[in-house]
Swiss-Prot record:
Biased composition (Acidic residues): 61-71
Organism: Solanum lycopersicum (Tomato)
A Gene Ontology BP annotation from the UniProt entry: nitrate assimilation
Keyword rRNA-binding attached: no
Cofactor: FAD; heme; Mo-molybdopterin
SUPFAM superfamilies: Cytochrome b5-like heme/steroid binding domain (SSF55856), E set domains (SSF81296), Ferredoxin reductase-like, C-terminal NADP-linked domain (SSF52343), Oxidoreductase molybdopterin-binding domain (SSF56524), Riboflavin synthase domain-like (SSF63380)
EC numbers, comma separated: 1.7.1.1
Protein name: Nitrate reductase [NADH]
Length: 911
C-alpha cells in the first residue's frame, strides 16, 4: 500500500469570456477538473465591453505550456460534466414560498423543509464530478428568501473609514478593476453536523458530509476596492471590514445578513479575497449570490456574504445579529440558555474564521455491498475520499485505519491545484488507498484522519458544541457481513449518518438502541411531548384547516395545536416556512429542523389538542405518543361524534388521500396505464380541468412527490387513470438513475396504496373557451396547444373536456413533440379525435429522429415555420397552451410564439 503525493498544476489561461482574462489552466493528465469555461448558451453575460487585463494568480513554478489540443480536451471534460446533469426546474416544493421563481436541481437534499432553501448534493454525485462541482449541485445555505436582483440596478457601496466613499455599479466592478479567477473550496461550518445531533441535538439542522463544494470564482480583489476608496489607517480606527447583504431576515427582530473580518485580512494580498461576480464561467446563480458576493478563500462559508450591498470599514466588528448568533464554537458545557444568559455569543475567542482540518470517506458509499467471492478477493478494493484544511494550508497526509487506530496506512494524495505565489492551497484534495478485501472482511470499521502542513490533525472523538459546528472527528464507516444473494456473503458499509431527515447510518442505529435501553415502559410527562391534559381545549382537523393564513396560522405537531400567528415576524426561518404549513400537520418537518430549545419555545404557543384516536401524522406514520395510551379510550366517544360523512369529492386541499392500485396495463415497453381506486366508490376525484395532482411515495427512505395529470375524465366515479412513461435506469445518459417515481409506479403490485395530494396548478378550464388563470378570466375560440413528451397529458385533459361538451365549439390545434414515434403518448386517441372532428381538432407531430419509413410529419425540433403552418395566428380570441420540458418552453416555444406576434405574457398559458 505505497503512498505518494501528486501536485496537479494550473497555469495562466488565455483571455476567456468577453475579453476577461482567465487565470489558470489544468494539466491534461489531471482526472479531476479545472477551469477555462466556454460561454454558456443560457447564461448570457450582461457585460460585453473591453475590460482591464486580469491580475493573474502568481505561482511558484514556471508556466506549463500546454497546447490547444490539451485545453480543448479539458473543455470537453467540463461539457461532459454538464451533460450528466438533469436540468434545473421550478421545484414543486418551492410552490407557495418566496423562492418559487428559482430553478433548482431536484436531486439536492433539502435539510430545512420547504423554506428557506438549505441543501447539499448526494455525496456520491458530488464526488462523481471530482475537483470542480457543477453549480446546480453546489451546496446552498440560505437564511431566508433569495432577493430578486437586477444587474443593471445593483450597486455596492464602500463607506465608513475611507477617504472617498463610493458606490460601484456592476459594470464598473467588471470594467474598471482588474479581476482574479481561481478555484476555491467553500465549506459550511456545519458540515457533518448531523453526527453531533446524533449525540445531542444542537440548535442547527442536519448537514451531512456534502456541505462542501469547489467552483471557479472570478471577481475584483477586495483590497483594490478599498484602495480606490482610500481606506484609512489603523491609527485612525480602521480595524475591521464589514460586509452586508440585501436579504432582510427575521433574526434579532429584523436585520440583514452581515459579518466582518479584520482589516489586516482584507488588505493581505496573500489571502486572495475577492468581490465575486462569476462562478464556473457564468454569472452567479440566485442561490449563490447574484449578482455579487464575497469569496474569502480558506474561511468558512458564513463569512462570504451573498447579495453584497455594502462594505463598511469600521473600528468595531459587524453589529449584525448573524455575526454574533451564528458561526461560533462554544465550549461543550455551554447550551443555548447559558450562552444567552452569560453572553457567550459575544466573546471574540469563540468566533470561527478559518476552516479546520477535515476528511471524509466517500468510497465505499453508504449501504454499498461488496460481494466476497473468488473474483473480488483476487484484487484490492480502493477506498476514496476528500480532505481539506483552512487558511491556505496544504493537506500533507491522510491515513486510514482498519483496527481502531492501532495501525495506520498512508494514502495517496491528489492535489489538483498548484500553490499560489504565497504557497497557499485554497481547494480540497482527494485521497485513495488500496486495501485487501480479506482485510476488510476481518475488520469492523474504516476510519480516516488528515493532517495539514502545520501538523494539525483530526481528533479521534467528536467534541459537541451547541451550534454543531466544525465537526472534524475521525470519519468512520462501519462494516457488517451480509448475504446479498443466496449462497453468497458480502460486506455492507454504513456511514455514520444520512443528511437532513433521511434515515440510516450507524449512529442513528446506536442512538435508537440507547433510547430503547433506557425507555420507561409507561408514558412520562415532558415538555417536548407533554401528557395530554383532558381539560385542554379540543379542536377537530376541519377547524384547524381554517386557520391557514397570516391572520391566523395554526399548526399541528405531535397531535398538539399551536397558534403561530404572533410568532410569524420573529421566526428565524421567515414567514413563508410557517404559512406554507399553516392549517396542517407539520410534525415531520418540525422535528427534522428544530432543536430541543425550539420545541420548548413552541409550548408558549400551544392552544389545544387535536380530536383523534391513535393519532398519526399526515407525513410521519406512527410518530405520536398517543397511539397506545389511555387517552385513546378517553377520546374514542368524542371521535364518533365528530366524524364527517363520506365526501363526494376525494381530493382534500393540503391533505393526502390514500388510493389503491386496482389495474395496470402495459401499453408499450415503457408506457403504462394505471388505474387507482378512490377512498370511496361514490366519489369523484375532484380535480378541475387544467389542474394536476401530486403522487407521494417513500422511495429509498425519502419522500418523493411528482406531478401528474389524469387521463380519465373529471366525472369518473370511484377511480382515476394515469398514462405514465417509465424512465428506466441506465437508458438515458443524462438521467442514469432513471425516473424515481415512474420506476416506483412500475414496481407497485396490484393492491398497493399511493398517497395523492391536490388539486394544484394555476390554470383551470371552465368550459366553452373560458379559463381561470391565477384568478383572472381569459377566453379563446381557438387554442394553439403545444406539448412535449409527457406534457401532452394536461393538453389531453382540456381537449377531452371540450369534446365531451356538445355546446363547446372551441377549436384546437395541437403540435406535439417527442424524441421518436415510439415516445408519442395517447396517439390513437389524438388521431381518433382529429378524424372524428377534423374541423375542430388538428394534430401535428414533431420527432427528433424518425425510425419509420414514410413518416409524414415533421422531423427535428419545434420551429417558427412549423408553428406558423400548424397553429392559428395570434388574435384577441386565441390562446396558446404549452406543457413540456423547461428548455423546450424557453428555447422553442417562447421565442417562436413571439416571432409570430403572440404576447406570451398574456396569451401563453404554461401548465
Amino acid at each position: 500500500m505505497a503512498a505518494s503525493v501528486e501536485n496537479r498544476q494550473y497555469t495562466h489561461l488565455e483571455p476567456g469570456l468577453s475579453g476577461v482574462g482567465r487565470t489558470f489552466k489544468p494539466r491534461p493528465d489531471s482526472p479531476v477538473r479545472g477551469c477555462n469555461f466556454p460561454p454558456s448558451s443560457n447564461h448570457e453575460l450582461p457585460f460585453q465591453k473591453k475590460q482591464n487585463p486580469p491580475i493573474y494568480l502568481d505561482y511558484s513554478s514556471s508556466e506549463d505550456e500546454d497546447d490547444d489540443d490539451e485545453k480543448n480536451e479539458y473543455v470537453q471534460m467540463i461539457k461532459k460534466g454538464k451533460t450528466e446533469l438533469e436540468p434545473s426546474i421550478h421545484d414543486t416544493r418551492d410552490e407557495g414560498t418566496a423562492d418559487n421563481w428559482i430553478e433548482r436541481n431536484f436531486s439536492l437534499i433539502r435539510l430545512t423543509g420547504k423554506h428557506p432553501f438549505n441543501s447539499e448534493p448526494p455525496l456520491s454525485r458530488l464526488m462523481h464530478h471530482g475537483f470542480i462541482t457543477p453549480v446546480p449541485l453546489h451546496y446552498v445555505r440560505n437564511h431566508g428568501p433569495v432577493p430578486k436582483a437586477s444587474w443593471s440596478d445593483w450597486t455596492v457601496e464602500v463607506t465608513g473609514l475611507v477617504k472617498r466613499p463610493m458606490k460601484f455599479t456592476m459594470d464598473q466592478l467588471v470594467n474598471e478593476f482588474p479581476s482574479r479567477e481561481f478555484p476555491v473550496t467553500l465549506v459550511c461550518a456545519g458540515n457533518r453536523r448531523k453526527e453531533q445531533n446524533m449525540v445531542k441535538q444542537t440548535i442547527g439542522f442536519n448537514w451531512g458530509a456534502a456541505a462542501v463544494s469547489t467552483t471557479v470564482w472570478r471577481g475584483v480583489p477586495l483590497r483594490a476596492l478599498l484602495k480606490r476608496c482610500g481606506v484609512q489607517s489603523k491609527k485612525k480606527g480602521a480595524l475591521n471590514v464589514c460586509f452586508e447583504g440585501s436579504d432582510v431576515l427575521p433574526g434579532g427582530g429584523g436585520s440583514k445578513y452581515g459579518t466582518s473580518i479584520k482589516k489586516e485580512f482584507a488588505m493581505d494580498p496573500s489571502r486572495d479575497i475577492i468581490v465575486a461576480y462569476m462562478q464556473n464561467g457564468e454569472m452567479l446563480s440566485p442561490d449563490h449570490g447574484f449578482p455579487v458576493r464575497m469569496i474569502i478563500p480558506g474561511f468558512i462559508g458564513g463569512r462570504m456574504v451573498k447579495w453584497l450591498k455594502r462594505i463598511v470599514v469600521t473600528t468595531q466588528e459587524s453589529e449584525s445579529y448573524y455575526h454574533y448568533k451564528d458561526n461560533r464554537v462554544l465550549p461543550p458545557h455551554v447550551d443555548a440558555e447559558l450562552a444567552n444568559a452569560e453572553a457567550w455569543w459575544y466573546k471574540p475567542e469563540y468566533i470561527i474564521n478559518e476552516l479546520n482540518i477535515n476528511s471524509v470517506i466517500t468510497t465505499p458509499c453508504h449501504e454499498e455491498i461488496l460481494p466476497i467471492n473468488a473474483w473480488t478477493t483476487q484484487r484490492p478494493y480502493t477506498l476514496r475520499g476528500y480532505a481539506y484544511s483552512g487558511g491556505g494550508k496544504k493537506v500533507t497526509r491522510v491515513e486510514v485505519t482498519l483496527d481502531g487506530g492501532e495501525t495506520w496506512s498512508v494514502c495517496t494524495l491528489d492535489h489538483p491545484e498548484k500553490p499560489t505565489k504565497y504557497g497557499k492551497y485554497w481547494c480540497w484534495c482527494f485521497w485513495s488507498l488500496e486495501v485487501e478485501v480479506l482485510d476488510l472482511l476481518s475488520a469492523k470499521e474504516i476510519a480516516v484522519r488528515a493532517t495539514d502542513e502545520t501538523l494539525n490533525t483530526q481528533p479521534e472523538k467528536l467534541i459537541w458544541n451547541v451550534m454543531g459546528m466544525m465537526n472534524n472527528c475521525w470519519f468512520r464507516v462501519k462494516m457488517n457481513v451480509c448475504k446479498p444473494h443466496k449462497g453468497e456473503i458480502g460486506i455492507v458499509f454504513e456511514h455514520p449518518t444520512q443528511p437532513g431527515n433521511q434515515s440510516g447510518g450507524w449512529m442513528a442505529k446506536e442512538r435508537h438502541l440507547e433510547i430503547s435501553a433506557v425507555a420507561p415502559p409507561t408514558l412520562k410527562k415532558s415538555i417536548s411531548t407533554p401528557f395530554m391534559n383532558t381539560a385542554s381545549k379540543m379542536y377537530s382537523m376541519s377547524e384547524v384547516r381554517k386557520h391557514n393564513s397570516s391572520d391566523s396560522a395554526w399548526i399541528i405537531v405531535h397531535g398538539h395545536i399551536y397558534d403561530a400567528s404572533r410568532f410569524l415576524k420573529d421566526h428565524p426561518g421567515g414567514v413563508d416556512s410557517i404559512l406554507i404549513n399553516a392549517g396542517t400537520d407539520c410534525t415531520e418537518e418540525f422535528d427534522a429542523i428544530h432543536s430541543d430549545k425550539a420545541k420548548k419555545l413552541l409550548e408558549d404557543f400551544r392552544i389545544g389538542e387535536l380530536i383523534t384516536t391513535g393519532y398519526t401524522s399526515d407525513s410521519s406514520p406512527n410518530s405520536s405518543v398517543h397511539g397506545s395510551s389511555s387517552i385513546s379510550s378517553f377520546l374514542a366517544p368524542i371521535k364518533e361524534l365528530v366524524q364527517t360523512p363520506t365526501r363526494s369529492v376525494a381530493l382534500i386541499p393540503r391533505e393526502k388521500i390514500p388510493c389503491k392500485l386496482v389495474d395496470k396495463q402495459s401499453i408499450s415497453h415503457d408506457v403504462r396505464k394505471f388505474k387507482f381506486a378512490l377512498p370511496s366508490e361514490d366519489q369523484v376525484l375532484g380535480l378541475p380541468v387544467g389542474k394536476h395532482i401530486f403522487l407521494c411515495a417513500t422511495v429509498d427512505d425519502k419522500l418523493c412527490m411528482r406531478a401528474y395529470t389524469p387521463t380519465s375524465t373529471v366525472d369518473e366515479v370511484g377511480f382515476f387513470e394515469l398514462v405514465v412513461k417509465i424512465y428506466f435506469k441506465g437508458v438515458h445518459p443524462k438521467f442514469p438513475n432513471g425516473g424515481q417515481m415512474s420506476q416506483h409506479l412500475d414496481s407497485l403490485p396490484i393492491g398497493a396504496f399511493l398517497d395523492v395530494k391536490g388539486p394544484l396548478g394555476h390554470i383551470e378550464y371552465q368550459g366553452k373557451g373560458n379559463f381561470l388563470v391565477h384568478g383572472k378570466q381569459k377566453f379563446a375560440k381557438k387554442l394553439a396547444m403545444i406539448a412535449g413528451g409527457t406534457g401532452i397529458t394536461p393538453v389531453y385533459q382540456v381537449m377531452q373536456s371540450i369534446l365531451k361538451d356538445p355546446e363547446d365549439d372551441t377549436e384546437m390545434y395541437v403540435v406535439y413533440a417527442n424524441r421518436t414515434e415510439d415516445d408519442i403518448l395517447l396517439k390513437d386517441e389524438l388521431d381518433a379525435w382529429a378524424e372524428q372532428v377534423p374541423n375542430r381538432v388538428k394534430v401535428w407531430y414533431v420527432v427528433q429522429e424518425s425510425i419509420t419509413q414514410g413518416w409524414k410529419y415533421s422531423t427535428g425540433f419545434v420551429t417558427e415555420s412549423i408553428l406558423r403552418e400548424h397553429i392559428p395566428e395570434p388574435s384577441h380570441t386565441t390562446l396558446a397552451l404549452a406543457c413540456g420540458p423547461p428548455p423546450m418552453i424557453q428555447f422553442a416555444i417562447n421565442p417562436n410564439l413571439e416571432k409570430m406576434g403572440y404576447d406570451i405574457k398574456e396569451e401563453l398559458l404554461v401548465f
